[in-house]
Amino acid sequence: MSSSYDEASLAPEETTDSFWEVGNYKRTVKRIDDGHRLCNDLMNCVQERAKIEKAYGQQLTDWAKRWRQLIEKGPQYGSLERAWGAIMTEADKVSELHQEVKNNLLNEDLEKVKNWQKDAYHKQIMGGFKETKEAEDGFRKAQKPWAKKMKELEAAKKAYHLACKEEKLAMTREMNSKSEQSVTPEQQKKLQDKVDKCKQDVQKTQEKYEKVLEDVGKTTPQYMENMEQVFEQCQQFEEKRLVFLKEVLLDIKRHLNLAENSSYIHVYRELEQAIRGADAQEDLRWFRSTSGPGMPMNWPQFEEWNPDLPHTTTKKEKQPKKAEGVALTNATGAVESTSQAGDRGSVSSYDRGQPYATEWSDDESGNPFGGSEANGGANPFEDDSKGVRVRALYDYDGQEQDELSFKAGDELTKLGEEDEQGWCRGRLDSGQLGLYPANYVEAI
């Protein structure tokens, strides 16, 4: 029996994951198909980013439009108003830049990948790509002779291992027969002949196994050379894809990186100049001259009566009757419109064009605090018959000095209809006057 024989050698040979094993070239072939799919993935990636750029640009435009209108209608004035408005201008310009990013991504980067993919991969009528089939055929042709030798080698090895197994079994039987009295000399001779025959089979199969192994060793260099040649062709194809996609990614980076865009830098240079141009003293002087002590005034002068002139209507007579929009603020008797009272500190609810009370008179006919009945201008807050009793549905804590506070279930007197801002005038049983949310009460 061959001394190199071991029963472990009868176990199935473990296949390795090496490229040189039969069929393991398929990973290299699959890489070609993967390259085509990765081009599609990159185009989808770019397309999604373009959608994000477009949406962000539109959001900036909408935001700038809304706030530009609010600022124009709001109370801010002068150079600071212009500085604030410059933020909206920045948004519009940046929006345009993001739209440019979107256009560059779609019209340049995506189209570049699409055209390269079309030139690099050629579809076949029967499916798949020409490049994939060429690689598959090249590897198969290079591997075919060696694969045939490997098949012969596997068969020779299997025959040799089987002969060794038979030899060991025959020797075991022959040795056991010597200790058994029932075995005749003739049977003993047959067992010995079997052992001799098995030894001859082992010798023959070993010689054949070694010869085939030698042949495989001789064909291996040529096999490796042929496989390397096909593999290098695949490497060159893949190198083109890798280099190309790297260039595309750099183009994408250049289009996305607004920090290196001269127009983007110019936008913020202009914005900073606009903000630094705001001058508090200039704004204060402007307000003084247009809404403060610096305004011109037609001071009262003695005017002779002229019977030939028509009756001159005073400003008070021309002034339209105040709507229900008069609200008492506190015990000092200050008055403000309900539209102003309804504005709770947000410029979005402010209207620069809203009217302001420009007339003041101690004439009780126009003074809601006057109590004389002779002038027909009785205080509406002093007569319960002119109010409506209501009950609070919820607790409310006044946020401003002109607002009432009450608890759910408290009763008070409603002294006017709900204004456009959702507020009503009312009076608590304690006599306090003020505003409250109209939807916080119900009629009794």
From Swiss-Prot:
Compartment annotation: Cytoplasm; Cell projection; Synapse, Synaptosome; Cell projection, Ruffle membrane
Protein name from the UniProt record: Protein kinase C and casein kinase substrate in neurons protein 1
SMART domains per the UniProt record, alphabetical: FCH, SH3
Highest rank taxon of the organism: Eukaryota
Function, as annotated: Binds to membranes via its F-BAR domain and mediates membrane tubulation. Plays a role in the reorganization of the microtubule cytoskeleton via its interaction with MAPT; this decreases microtubule stability and inhibits MAPT-induced microtubule polymerization. Plays a role in cellular transport processes by recruiting DNM1, DNM2 and DNM3 to membranes. Plays a role in the reorganization of the actin cytoskeleton and in neuron morphogenesis via its interaction with COBL and WASL, and by recruiting COBL to the cell cortex.
Domain F-BAR: 13-283
Segments of skewed composition (Basic and acidic residues): 314-324
Description of how the protein assembles with itself and partners: Homodimer. May form heterooligomers with other PACSINs. Interacts with both COBL and DBNL. Identified in a complex composed of COBL, PACSIN1 and WASL. Interacts (via SH3 domain) with SYNJ1 and WASL. Interacts (via SH3 domain) with DNM1; the interaction is reduced by DNM1 phosphorylation. Interacts with DNM2 and DNM3. Interacts with MAPT. Interacts with EHD1 and EHD3. Interacts with TRPV4.
Phosphotyrosine PTM positions: 394
Pfam family membership, one: FCH
Coiled coil regions, renumbered to chain: 26-275
Post-translational modification: Phosphorylated by casein kinase 2 (CK2) and protein kinase C (PKC).
Native species: Pongo abelii (Sumatran orangutan)
